Amino acid sequence: IRLSLVGSEMCIRDSSIRARCGVEMVAHLTCVSSTRETVRARIEAMHEAGVENVLALRGDLPAELAGADRSAWPYRYATDLIGDLRASGYGFCIGAACYPEVHPESANQREDIRRLKEKVDAGCSFLTTQMFFDNGLLYNFLYKIREAGITVPVIAGIMPITSATQIERAIRLSG
């Protein structure tokens, strides 16, 4: 379930699914180019709707913002969003994304793991990987993050393939 500008409606849908089906849901909250006020409103809406689990993501940069100066943005990284979720005091179980094949904006895996550690230190309780195609890369990644002191659970991100277009888009977005 993604939260949009009408986040409270999406949160209510999330709570309804949990109540009817007994299935824990994880709200996906993105913050790319968002204001603190917008994000605070979404956090409040999630809390009021009884959302407990949040996957905190920066989100994909829209094409028109690809070259923009992001230095003044309140949410340059998911870490900023994780900090605000934790500071809300609502006790969300906060997850974040990780990249066994290195985030496309990272210079290298060492930098990527350093940023991942920052997410965990900011209050992330679990990680879910981006889609990957080589189990060896995942095992190597898990070894390296454990070596870096990252001990939270890691969930392998699995996406059922339904079309060639879907997989091509996923590959483009994940670098």
Per-range role (PLM):
Residues M25-L29, V54-A56, I94-C98, V120, ...:
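Hydrophobic faces of well-ordered beta-strands that scaffold small-molecule active sites
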Residues T35-A45, I113-R115, Y139-R146, S163-A170:
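Catalytic cores of alpha/beta
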Residues E105-A122, L127:
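Active-site glycine-rich loop that binds ribose-phosphate moieties when present
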Residues M25-E37, G95-E111:
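Active-site mouth loops of central-metabolism enzymes
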